[in-house]
């Protein structure tokens, strides 16, 4: 009889533990959903602030969105970082934008777009060697993006470095071809 009571007690305990775990999981999922909604709301406010020229407000909103992130970094946080860097640049905080791109590259060392955008900023600050290295890394991690090669060439040419950009232009032609139809992208 005593053994039967112990078994029933264990069943009851396991049942309560299972219910507790399910309720906890549901609450945490609800919190995660709420955080994601808050993050999206802040992101939207940031984008709207950028569109109206309120870059400081945009930065505050993007920082608020990123503060909602706890745990795993997702594509949403990466997207918010791109917006944050754009707002920093628009607010003439090139150093802040560079730091944001540095953080993105530290997180994902193969983020070709972050390398490209950081290279563009470095080019604008006069760090041509740093820009060239970032452009090389961008194509290293996204070697089949025709438009990336063309954009690198255009950026280099805009800073009187067309000669350095010629290799990128030639690589673009090897990706897409150099007949008239291919060039009409």
What is each of the regions a protein language model found here?
Residues 39, 73-74, 78-79, 112-113, ...:
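Helix-start (N-cap) detector for alpha-helical repeat units in TPR-like alpha-solenoids
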Residues 65, 103-104, 137-138, 171-172:
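Canonical positions in the second alpha-helix
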Residues 70, 109, 143, 177-178:
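Short coil turns that delineate tetratricopeptide repeat
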Residues 76-79, 83, 117, 151, ...:
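Canonical tetratricopeptide repeat
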């Amino acid at each position: 009889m005593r053994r039967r009571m112990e078994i029933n007690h264990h069943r009851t305990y396991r049942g309560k533990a299972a219910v507790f775990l399910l309720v906890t999981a549901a609450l945490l999922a609800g919190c995660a959903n709420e955080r994601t909604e808050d993050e999206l709301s802040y992101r939207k406010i940031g984008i709207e602030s950028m569109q109206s020229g309120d870059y400081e407000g945009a930065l505050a909103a993007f920082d608020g969105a990123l503060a909602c992130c706890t745990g795993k970094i997702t594509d949403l946080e990466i997207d918010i970082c791109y917006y944050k860097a754009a707002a920093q640049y628009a607010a003439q905080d090139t150093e802040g934008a560079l730091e944001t791109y540095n953080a993105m590259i530290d997180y994902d060392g193969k983020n070709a777009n972050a390398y490209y955008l950081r290279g563009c900023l470095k080019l604008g600050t006069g760090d041509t060697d740093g820009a060239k290295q970032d452009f090389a890394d961008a194509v290293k991690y996204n070697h089949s993006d025709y438009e990336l090669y063309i954009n690198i060439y255009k950026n280099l040419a805009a800073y009187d470095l067309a000669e350095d950009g010629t290799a990128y232009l030639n690589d673009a032609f090897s990706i897409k071809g150099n007949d008239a139809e291919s060039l009409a992208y």
